[in-house]
Amino acid sequence: MARILVGLSGGVDSSVAAALLVEQGHDVVGAYMKNWVNDEGIPGECPWEQDIQDALAVAKTTGIEFRVIDLVDEYRARIVNYLIEGYRAGYTPNPDVLCNREMKFGVFLDYALEQGFDYVATGHYARRMDTPQGAFILRGRDPNKDQSYFLSLMRPDQIARAVFPLGDLLKPEVRVLAEKYGLPTARKKDSQGICFIGQVKMSDFLRHYLPDKPGNIVDTEGRTLGTHNGLHLFTMGQRKGHGVASPREGVAYVVVGKDVRRNRLILGYEDASTRGLYASRAVVGGISNTLAPLPARVMAQPRYRAKAEWASCEYLEEGKVRLGFDTPLRALAVGQVCAFYDGGKLLGGGFFESIEP
């Protein structure tokens, strides 16, 4: 049996993960990663104190040791700064994906290894498979909860130390197990929002760090349609919130681009022919592969819950590929994470660096 440090978030998924590992006979210790404290007056609830109490109650119920690990400084340096600077530059960051590589299976894993643990376990709906060539990640059994996308930037050495007890379970089965084990989180609602920041709205979070920067809203021909308060408040494909009514009945205006240099938000019609809305090619960099270089044909998933689409894959240089999508993809954004699959097998992931029509 292994010595495993399980990340207890105070939610039902990590609670059941811990209970399963105890039932399997492992030497389990639970730890809450204290990554964020909303002490700067940002609107919204960040219930970390209640989450700690819930995690502690789970540890008592399962009979395991419980620790609170203060990672606030590391989280700010690795995740919050990445998020703020990405939006400042006009990108669309994905803190939840980076959080897994840098925090849960980065700083937290380093702590675990220093403390003599063999593995780190989380409540992700994903599976790990070991082969003679190394370990890789498979999609979770539950197609509605599969979270392998969020693990797509993990390095091979991190995957080898990861345990996902919920990978073969459906979400309803997890709820049933939580009741069976008598866990105090059995009926707790799933959390939403930015990784570890709770119910804080992204717009409120960004406004706290990035002051309004008014600019013009234009159409694809450069005609002025209105004004905006900051490019960081908008994302590609966004239909609402820009305040511009479409002159075409039944066809909405959507965000199709950002001109960062001139601080202009570009709108176009929700139409396949609109320049900038659909992409047939893209360059992906910062690639983290699990086992081997990407093949010439891959399935590319551009965001969580999006369908993975077939694409040609050409290496440009180390860590960068150009994708050619069989079917043009809607509203891709620089900075988003693209995950690569071979069926249900996760091959790795990277960041969109440029988008081509």
Swiss-Prot record:
EC number of the protein? 2.8.1.13
Site positions for Interaction with tRNA: H124, Q336
Task: Give the enzyme class.
Answer: transferase
Region Interaction with target base in tRNA: list its residue ranges. 94-96
Question: Which GO cellular component does the record give, naming just one?
Answer: cytoplasm
User: Which pairs of Cys residues are joined through disulfide bonds in the record?
Assistant: C99-C195
Q: Where would you find this protein in the cell?
A: Cytoplasm
- Quote the record's binding site residues for ATP: G7, L8, S9, G10, G11, V12, D13, S14, M33, G123
Q: Which GO terms of the molecular function aspect are on file?
A: ATP binding; tRNA binding; tRNA-uridine 2-sulfurtransferase activity
A Pfam family that this protein carries is tRNA_Me_trans_M
Catalytic reaction annotation: S-sulfanyl-L-cysteinyl-[protein] + uridine(34) in tRNA + AH2 + ATP = 2-thiouridine(34) in tRNA + L-cysteinyl-[protein] + A + AMP + diphosphate + H(+)
Query: What keyword terms does UniProt attach to this protein?
Result: ATP-binding, Cytoplasm, Disulfide bond, Nucleotide-binding, RNA-binding, Transferase, tRNA processing, tRNA-binding
Which biological process annotations from GO are given for this protein? tRNA wobble position uridine thiolation
Source superkingdom: Bacteria
Region (Interaction with tRNA) residue spans: 145-147, 303-304
Q: Does the keyword ATP-binding apply?
A: yes
Where is this protein chiefly located? cytoplasm
Q: According to its UniProt record, which residues of this chain constitute the active site?
A: C99, C195
Q: Which HAMAP family match?
A: tRNA_thiouridyl_MnmA
Question: What function does the entry list?
Answer: Catalyzes the 2-thiolation of uridine at the wobble position (U34) of tRNA, leading to the formation of s(2)U34.
The UniProt similarity line reads: Belongs to the MnmA/TRMU family.
Question: What is the name of the protein in this document?
Answer: tRNA-specific 2-thiouridylase MnmA
Instruction: Identify the species of origin.
Output: Akkermansia muciniphila (strain ATCC BAA-835 / DSM 22959 / JCM 33894 / BCRC 81048 / CCUG 64013 / CIP 107961 / Muc)
